[in-house]
Amino acid sequence: MGLLACEKNLVEANQEWEFSNPKNANLKIVNTYTSNVPAGAPGVGVTRFYSYQNSSKLNGNALSSPGSWPGPTTYASLMPGSSTFNFLLDRRIGNNYGVIARGDTAFKGTITMEAGKYYTMFMIGESPSQSLYLVEDKLTDPQERFYAVRFANLVVSSTPKPIDVYSRRERKKIANNLIYKTVTDFTELALPSVSDTLDVMDAGTTRILYSFNTFVPTSRRIYTFYTYGRTGFAAERLTSYTNR
């Protein structure tokens, strides 16, 4: 009986995680942090983070860049309202928030989320001016044989430049003049018969900066593409995650 009860509780917990609880807020965290300072765990070579809502630890595995939490197509169901979020270096491995050593908190911010809504929290910038950028995800299921997509420009530069995004299958730009720390609305596009290539261009030109090759969207899925990197330090790239 005890084993069955345990399994039942796990199933209920998984259902709450996968399906939205209208009493909670839904959050996805995306790490685009480009600096390798402050240093993380010894010998790791990259800076990774554990995240806390108030004093509650959220992720079991440290989050590196580029990366998202929780898993694909999933949001974390969290307490709504105003909360303090702290992102601590992975050299702190305990579950308890406790007393924080000086320099261990790389990101900190007070975030307000409403019950029943979906959000993405981007970890952006470079040390020592990194910050948290919260965006509401207004998710509407696309029609059959269509998908939805949006774009975010999160490349760090001393002289940020706007970008355009060009779809080779659509043969047109599907995002225009996107400035730093800006996210477009979702756009619904017809499902391509073959894979697409998305080119990031200097705004107003046809000069390709970098591309995302072999994008194969799925019918009725919702995607976010974001640029990341730091001019002159970390290679600039375009990558994506699935909202739903």
Where in the sequence are the language-model features?
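Intrinsically disordered, low-complexity polar regions and short flexible loop motifs
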Residues: 6-244
